[in-house]
Amino acid sequence: TREEGLSVFNAWGGLIRLLAVRGHICQEAMDPGRYRLCPPFESMEREKAAFVLAMRYFTHFGPASLRDASYYFQKPQAQMKRIMDQLPLRQKMVDGMVRYDLPEEGEESVLPDIPDILFLAGFDQLLLGFQKKANSFLPARHLRGIFTMTGIIHPALLVSGDVAGRWNINARKLTATLFEPVNKRRLALVERAAQRYFGNEGLKEICVENPKGR
């Protein structure tokens, strides 16, 4: 029936979400429109699972602090530290704070270059993976420009490693707004990056602007 069909596919995920939550299907990497069956489930003890998840976190999110990990896993810092003490973590000083990572086997010592300008999705893991008030990528003065009081996390514009603005697409128009004024050359660099990333998305217009009234 129509009602049954609406319950299968709805704005909250419907049947797709239910199958994903239960561990039956997952999205294909780099292709949000395709799904695959999850590998057979193998249960493990809670303590071992916490260890494995922490290992994955510091491998892919590090350098991260104890506070970051506690925030991400929603565990008390004392409990998180006991888990971290079991890992062969590498300690680093980043922005005056002790942080840790877990390099993958055979990892090169030189990190690859990343683009100077990146358009992050809303609720991006670069923002969710760290305690928001101490995130190295998010200057404190711009916190409320990305994290709203109602729980929304806006798509962020990352410039030279720092969140410098936010962006959205509405009615086939991309608008990127900087949080602080920059010169015309910088605006042009952001616009070219937008054209590079979204040039095949059928946009009618790309607008990169300084904050209103500044």
Briefly describe each language-model feature range:
Residues 1-214:
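Long, charged, low-complexity, helical-prone intrinsically disordered regions
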